[in-house]
Amino acid sequence: MATQLDYYAILEVSRTATADELKKSYRKLAMKYHPDRNPGDDAAEAKFKEINQAYDILKDEQKRAAYDQYGHAAFEGGGPGPGGFDFGGGFGGGGLGDIFEQMFGDMMGGRRGGRARTGNDIQTHVEITLEEAFSGVKKDVRVITRVACEACHGTGSDDGASGVEVCPSCHGAGKVRAQQGFFVVERPCPTCHGAGKVVKNPCKVCHGEGTVEKERTVEVQIPAGVEDGTRIRLSGEGEAGGNGVPPGDLYIHVSVTEHGIFQRDGANIYCRVPLRMAQAALGTEIEVPVIDGSRTKVKIPAGTQTGAHFRLRGKGFSVLRSTARGDMYIQVTVETPQNLSKRQRELLEEFEKEAGEDVKQSPEHTGFFRRVRDFFEGKE
């Protein structure tokens, strides 16, 4: 039996890692080993699959708890399989939900319907720019997944649909009941692994699975206003289930790259603009870029200080599922001149001599040093 790697080791985190630490490490590793960044590298592709499998378990609190207690045995048999756990729909497939349902089902008005089985979900990653997050963008995402076998049309049998029969053990239910102490619990059928069907004369291409591994490209529409770390779900774009089972879902984790000019905070966007000392003192009009590619002019009043903000309404990001928009803020930094010429130094020295202790010209400076003087005088 092949050695199964520890999921925490795969994600390079400790067993006490928080959800945020898991997500951060997952995104970093997914970007590093993504097939698009490592074309033709089978080792990177295998590593990428391991990373997604590990994160799929550890990001779910219930699955993580089961893994911490039972290790890989908690998910043996295809998850859910014989002896494994299925956490969908609230402890389905032999969990606490079935125990309490057996005890109280009749009093509660009968049993609930079983959750429909589907193929496995897929986790992948896409990186976009801040401009693309602002405007929205279509991206082609490459995924390596299992698709319906063309040779048997997904039935798993060389005989097609006629070669698939109702499971004789569970009679098509996909589950069997077993006595555990005082309780009767349901588990996935060990004969058909929960499919409710068995294959006669297995397909020689897919060996009765009904699915084969294949790389395909999926187009995803990333909406305007999407934030870094957003997860987009594409229903039915996951792995095919085989034997007529519906496909799972595709989850795309969006990463927004840092920008050289703009910083985002929610729906608002910030742009830091340096001003020369004379511009800040005398006042000026500057032209600044906007995230949509346009430019706009901003009037800077005389006497502007470092840290001053100027607000441009409606120039920020759109808010998802809303008509609202954020604002853009220009943050001013007054730059002290360096490498002065002799003439510039003389002018500044003359300016300093002229300004002196004029409170009106330098209220913060004058007030601060007055407080310092009072502080030391109080010590004497």
Curated annotation (Swiss-Prot):
Signal peptide: none
GO cellular component, one term: cytoplasm
GO biological process terms on file: chaperone cofactor-dependent protein refolding; DNA replication; protein refolding; response to heat
Sequence ranges of the CXXCXGXG motif repeats: 149-156, 167-174, 189-196, 203-210
Record key words, sorted: Chaperone, Cytoplasm, DNA replication, Metal-binding, Repeat, Stress response, Zinc, Zinc-finger
Ranges where the J domain occurs: 6-71
Amino acids binding Zn(2+) 2: C167, C170, C189, C192
SUPFAM superfamilies: Chaperone J-domain, DnaJ/Hsp40 cysteine-rich domain, HSP40/DnaJ peptide-binding domain
Entry's localization field: Cytoplasm
Zn finger region (CR-type): 136-215
Cofactor dependency: Zn(2+)
Lineage: superkingdom: Bacteria
Keyword Zinc-finger: yes
Binding-site list for Zn(2+) 1: C149, C152, C203, C206
Main location: cytoplasm
CDD domains associated with the record: DnaJ, DnaJ_C, DnaJ_zf
GO molecular function: ATP binding; heat shock protein binding; unfolded protein binding; zinc ion binding
UniProt cofactor note: Binds 2 Zn(2+) ions per monomer.
Family, similarity comment: Belongs to the DnaJ family.
Role of this protein: Participates actively in the response to hyperosmotic and heat shock by preventing the aggregation of stress-denatured proteins and by disaggregating proteins, also in an autonomous, DnaK-independent fashion. Unfolded proteins bind initially to DnaJ; upon interaction with the DnaJ-bound protein, DnaK hydrolyzes its bound ATP, resulting in the formation of a stable complex. GrpE releases ADP from DnaK; ATP binding to DnaK triggers the release of the substrate protein, thus completing the reaction cycle.
Subunit note: Homodimer.
Record text about domains: The J domain is necessary and sufficient to stimulate DnaK ATPase activity. Zinc center 1 plays an important role in the autonomous, DnaK-independent chaperone activity of DnaJ. Zinc center 2 is essential for interaction with DnaK and for DnaJ activity.
Protein name per Swiss-Prot or TrEMBL: Chaperone protein DnaJ
Organism: Acetobacter pasteurianus (strain NBRC 105184 / IFO 3283-01)
Gene name for this UniProt entry: dnaJ
